Amino acid sequence: MAEIAAPTTPMMRQYLETKARYPDAILFFRLGDFYEMFFEDAIAASEALQITLTARAKGDEKVPMCGVPHHAARGYVARLLEKGFKVAICDQVEEPGRSAIVRREVTRVVTPGMVFDDQVLDPREASFLGSIAPGERGGGLALLDASTGLLQCGEVPDDARLVEELRRVGVRELLLPRGADPDRTDAIARAVGAPVARRDDAEFTRAEERLRRHLGVAGLEGFGVAGLPLGLAAAAAALAYLEETQRASPRHVDRIARLALEGVLLLDEATRANLELERSLSGGRRQGTLLALLDRSVTAPGGRRVAEWLRYPLLDPRAIGARLDAVEELCASSVAREDLAAALRPVGDAERLLSRIVLGQGNARDLRALAGALLALPALSDLLAGRQAEALRQAGGRMRGLEDLAGLLDRAVAEDPPASLREGGIVRRGHSRELDEIVAVAEDGKGTIARLEAKERERTGIGSLKVRYNRVFGYYIEVTKPNLHLVPKEYERRQTTVGGERFVTPELREFEERVLTAEERRFALEERIFEELRATVAEAAPRIRSAADAGATADALLSLARVAAERGWARPAVDSSEALEIEDGRHPVVEAMLPRDSGGFVPNDVAVASRGDPAFERHGCLHVITGPNMAGKSTVLRQAALTALLAQMGSFVPAGSARVGLVDRVFTRVGASDDLARGRSTFMVEMTETAAILHNATRRSLVVLDEIGRGTSTFDGVSIAWAVAEHLHDRVGCRTLFATHYHELQDLAREREGVRNLTVAVREVGDQVVFLRKLVAGGASRSYGIEVAKLAGLPAEVLARAREILRNLEALEMDEGGHAALARGRRHGAASPDQLGLFGAPPDPVAAGLREEIAGLDLDGLRPLDALNLIAAWKKRLG
């Protein structure tokens, strides 16, 4: 930043002094109808926004500058936020002309985690700021959604869990103490992938005292956060950041909650991605995800609540049952759903309206919208109070007690107020007699003059008397010379003209004062009334937030009921067992996206139970699922995991029936991709995810594995897959669904009592393969990879060659060198007996010995794993 030089203009000096206080932000400096940027800010902003960079003369130098219209600033701020910038908004806080230079102040700082503008925020996504107070291992974590006032904190045991929780909610910005180990905090920040704001260590100290003072309580025990010193430190820092950036007391943050780190079903990042809960694997979009299917909410807070429940499925059967009761009641009646939707609609996004108003960023339109929301609450409350489900009745009970405030706002705020206070007309007529009189003067000046003129003519008998105005004398009464003898004594002479004289009266002076200052007085009084209303809303913020929260819950339950009714889903039985029994289960998203003429989704049954559960003997704990490519193995795996997740979030499930024993964690190892940015190959990613499963799965977990070991050689892959399956069966004993193309793994069922073999059925019709999509008992002997390649459009020549090589491999046909005869049959000309083939070599004694051993094998008694071991030994002998 350029130094403040003596010859700078007062305005430029003001700019530089302000910029010095916000060195890490782009400074939007209000000049008239524009926000201007100078120096490095102008260069950075012009590049980011693709706007013209100009220059302003400063002595012999030219200062880079650019600007945006103040009425369009919101869009430009949003674009800068997307590119990772912070923006400090410096506004004029007094009218021009009252002093040599207009006083300006930074009214707020907009950062990625401190956004309140509804044109920038996604209405259906939370906007979390993450704050970390590092400990020796792990540390305190706070999550603050400043746009709604939600503040949560907790403590986690290690940095990996910190990252996992921050990525779970998709934090927009991260707070870290400056004094923390930079290597460690940099690693956390990189893993989270959010912009970082480093704050003074002091903001993480005296946390409990500061939080108690802000919340106005003697202790924090009632919030359930006592005994979390690091968590409270992170929360206090987040609250301080909110107050500093918004230049206002965040009274809408009226409570603090314990972060849901226990008592919820845990989903790591890989699982959330593999199951496509909130972002699709193709393009990272919301479309095609489970959340997109589930969110049938009427209001934005309802949509955010559905997303929250999806991120944090429950582990308490009673709490799950309470949600299911509400969903079942609403699902049973289309009239009940329609009535509730109609009652919820006018409530809108009261949470974010409240936040903007309390922080001084709301306008009269926000007050009007809040009035509409509050006016709708009594009818919504009555509707919910009449339901049977306790969750619905409880929500309705939290919406009472705001009728007086709703009435006040409705009476005070105009029906369609302007966005700006300076436009006037934000207060409804009849609310303030004083304001009504001022408005009448301002809007009926000519009528008042005409009435005054008529009154004076009648009183004085001067028929030619006129009331006039000019800029020099203001308002005056003009009397011609022939009528001067009729002028009353109280008239004060102001000027003599050729044709007569000009006078003023006390009444005319008073009128002039009223007219000339009416607009200013109107603006001032409307602003005062607006601030009084805002303060009244702020006082009621806890009650408003509670009512809005209840509305979000009711809307989320309605959303789940709508999906269940429209999709034909069933209520699951959720208990404390360790069984998972699904009859006629479907994949919710795949089914929803099928074309109408597709014939419908083919349902499947899944029944698996952890070791130790009474159902273990019937179902087994590990299902080895084989079958062709494209037959639907991965879909079956995912739909089983999604069924458990849906049940524990309190939703109906896409099945004929389902019994879900509580699952503490869902793990998935599905698909394969490189992580080039972190230098990890496909196989390394696969093994890292598998290691996390083996280290963290418990007997109550649900593990879904798809194609373990395929990123390396066949022998290595089979060995790893076999060992992983044994570990999960023998050591963990959890419910496991293991899809594989390694048919050798089917032999596990001979050795392990809890292993069951399943396959996805196909039917061969001539040289065509029909995928039946049905999961049946038994194993597969072929993967039909070449048939799938044909469907994909591989050239006929390539397919023919592939079939030839496959026949050689399946027959284990060896060439003269003892190698699988992959190249046999592909001759491009005669070759002499001594010529080396593509894979061949001259005959040797070792190869001859191997042929004899192979010829003597008892194939009927040979297990697949024994065969692999023999092949490995032969390979070693061949060098």
Question: Where in the sequence are the language-model features?
Answer:
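Active-site phosphate-binding and catalytic loops of NTP-dependent enzymes
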Residues: 88-90, 112-121, 249, 385-391, ...
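C-terminal tails and terminal domains of large nucleic-acid-associated
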Residues: 847-879
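Charged catalytic and DNA/RNA-contacting regions of genome-maintenance
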Residues: 2-329, 338, 345-358, 362-454, ...
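Extended, charged coiled-coil "arm/hinge" scaffolds of SMC/Rad50-like chromosome-maintenance ATPases
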Residues: 497-535
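Non-catalytic alpha-helical coupling and interface elements of nucleotide-dependent molecular machines
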Residues: 24, 50-51, 82-86, 92, ...
